Amino acid sequence: MSVTQVSNSLLADGSVTSAKLAAGAGGAFNNFLIKTTAYTAATRDQLIVNSSSAVTITLPASPSAGNVVFIKNAGAGVVTVGRNGSNINSQAQDGTLAADASATLVFVDSTIGFKEL
């Protein structure tokens, strides 16, 4: 079975086209990336980290307000969330995700940095 998700913004004109379907919804929980080694996230990345050893996921450099990154630790190893110069929850330190933990991080401003929802 194949399911295609389309956002309302793509259908604002009321028409469904193959180009709109190919563009995807661009919304939450779409196009997850599976990572087993260190990776620098891009804005809107939705990552599942699956590793038995420690892995570092580095947040995007020079983020803008509203940028979002989702990270899920599906492995046994600890995931370090590298702040890449931005604060995380107003703190100038990296974060960690234990096994089976997840975080949705939204960039607010240079003081708060990425805020965990």
Positions of PLM-derived features:
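Extracellular beta-sheet repeat scaffolds used for adhesion and glycan interaction
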Residues: 86-93
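Short proline/glycine- and polar residue-rich coil/turn motifs
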Residues: 96-99
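Fibrous stalk/shaft segments of extracellular and virion attachment machinery
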Residues: 1-33
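Short hydrophobic/aromatic beta-strand or adjacent loop that forms the aromatic wall/cage
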Residues: 101-104
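Exposed extracellular interaction/assembly regions and N-terminal maturation sites
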Residues: 22-85, 107-117
